Design a protein with these regions (language model features):
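Cell-envelope/glycan interface and biosynthesis
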Residues: 1-169, 176-216
């Protein structure tokens, strides 16, 4: 947001960020019961499927990760700004174009949303509603996802098929991204660090893999 401010753009407000499992359960139960009251003949499976169209199951929401948030615009006394649709504003356009430079990705691309020409990834993400949601994945991951035009699900699949990615800048190695399969049921495992760098991070991908990022 400091970079956006330097570009003359302000008014960003975080609408939602971390949401606890219990809060997610409350939202889920409320929507499930609302639908149940309107459709008494529906089976439990039908109610669950309908509820999932607008509310994630507890534990599967992006908000539960603590890494995601939504943005909107507000500035005290600025009615013109406050009425703007984020995706149509200059603030929104700047964020969509530049967020990857700071380790953020737009999480749920749809056809022509957030910007005209965007290709829907709903068939991968499972989300088919307009959500102005960003997720922090780190600059190395966001850089690759941006240049390959991938959503998070596509990126994980790409890493499963190509478990070693090298990113160069001006001819110099900048990042190495390595995925190792450790298994879904592994509570402990060992990893060999063979790169000549002390600056690395590790994270699990919820697909049985460990992603290690080396920065040079």
């Amino acid at each position: 947001l400091n970079a956006a401010k330097e570009a003359g753009l302000e008014g960003y407000v975080v609408r939602e960020a971390y949401r606890s499992i219990s809060d997610q359960q409350t939202l889920w139960d409320a929507e499930y019961n609302r639908l149940k009251g309107r459709h008494s003949a529906w089976t439990d499976d039908e109610l669950i499927a309908a509820t999932k169209k607008s509310i994630n199951l507890p534990g599967t929401s992006e908000y539960n990760s603590g890494l995601a948030f939504t943005l909107y615009l507000y500035e005290n006394g600025n009615d013109e700004l406050n009425k703007m649709v984020f995706s149509e504003s200059e603030q929104g356009k700047w964020m969509y174009e530049n967020s990857w430079k700071y380790g953020l990705v737009f999480r749920f691309p749809l056809q022509d949303f957030p910007t005209k020409g965007t290709i829907s990834r709903a068939y991968k993400t499972g989300v088919n509603v307009e959500m102005n949601l960003f997720r922090f994945v780190g600059i190395p991951n966001a850089t690759v996802m941006h240049h390959l035009d991938m959503c998070l699900e596509e990126y994980i699949e790409y890493l499963m098929a190509h478990p070693h990615i090298a990113v160069f800048e001006d001819g110099q190695l900048k990042y190495e991204i390595v995925r190792q399969q450790v298994g879904d049921d592994s509570s402990t495992f060992s990893v060999s660090i063979s790169r000549k760098t002390s600056n690395y991070t590790m994270s699990l991908d919820n697909m049985g893999g460990l992603i290690t990022i080396y920065e040079y």
